[in-house]
């Protein structure tokens, strides 16, 4: 045979006419999902509308979360270690218990920012405001930053001062916005040009929020 069956979603990265010219193989785009391939072959390479339609359900997004979470936790652990070091260096004169308390608070706040951006943003994706994924991540980050501020306001957080809370009001949305934007690579309906356009304005704001915080 001189026919090459490729997944439908490989289309944007394949120049079918060049494949034919250079190898002699005709490119046929098969179904989106591998599980439909046998039926596609049995029906004479005819795809049903269902084979051409890609869903992005809550469960399908949930399956992608472990990959996103592991990628976010690797640098996150290093940042948490730095926060502990800064807490011990800056608060050691106030006692090791106080230094440990500040370090733990910073670690929990950073983990919250990561979980918000890498877990909640993908799960709540269709219901979060905005079209840009960074805006979606930012919105859920702002919500949790507001909860953090409320906990401090009502005296439920005693291991951080007002300046630290202010810093986290900037850091949590910045981190969650970045991780939300990062999820565009796993989505089914974002375009390369759209992602590049979003990154041009979102990334500087996320970096600024992280640095100021």
Predicted regions: what they are:
Residues 9, 27, 110-114, 165, ...:
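Hydrophobic alpha-helical scaffolding
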Residues 14, 22-27, 51-53, 87, ...:
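Hydrophobic alpha-helical transmembrane segments
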Residues 65-151:
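Core alpha-helical transmembrane segments of integral membrane proteins
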Residues 32-74:
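Cytosolic juxtamembrane regions of integral membrane proteins
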Residues 14, 32-35, 115, 119, ...:
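Conserved active-site and cofactor/substrate-binding residues in soluble primary-metabolism enzymes
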Residues 24, 42-46, 50, 129, ...:
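Generic secondary-structure signature for well-ordered alpha-helical cores
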Residues 1-32:
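Soluble N-terminal domains of membrane-associated systems
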Residues 122, 126, 134-213:
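Generic detector of multi-pass transmembrane helix bundles and their immediately adjacent loops
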């Amino acid at each position: 045979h001189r026919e090459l069956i490729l997944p439908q979603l490989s289309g944007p990265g394949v120049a079918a006419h060049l494949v034919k010219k250079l190898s002699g193989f005709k490119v046929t785009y098969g179904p989106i999902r591998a599980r439909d391939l046998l039926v596609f072959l049995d029906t004479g390479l005819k795809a049903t509308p269902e084979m051409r339609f890609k869903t992005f359900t809550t469960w399908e997004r949930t399956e992608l979360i472990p990959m996103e979470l592991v990628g976010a936790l690797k640098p996150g652990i290093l940042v948490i270690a730095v926060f502990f070091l800064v807490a011990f260096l800056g608060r050691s004169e106030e006692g090791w218990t106080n230094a440990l308390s500040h370090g733990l608070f910073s670690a929990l706040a950073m983990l919250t920012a990561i979980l918000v951006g890498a877990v909640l943003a993908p799960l709540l994706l269709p219901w979060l405001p905005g079209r840009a994924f960074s805006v979606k991540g930012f919105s859920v980050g702002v919500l949790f930053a507001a909860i953090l501020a409320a906990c401090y306001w009502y005296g439920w957080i005693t291991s951080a001062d007002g300046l630290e809370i202010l810093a986290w009001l900037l850091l949590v949305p910045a981190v969650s916005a970045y991780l939300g934007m990062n999820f565009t690579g796993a989505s089914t309906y974002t375009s390369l040009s759209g992602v590049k356009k979003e990154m041009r304005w979102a990334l500087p704001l996320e970096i600024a929020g992280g640095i100021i915080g």
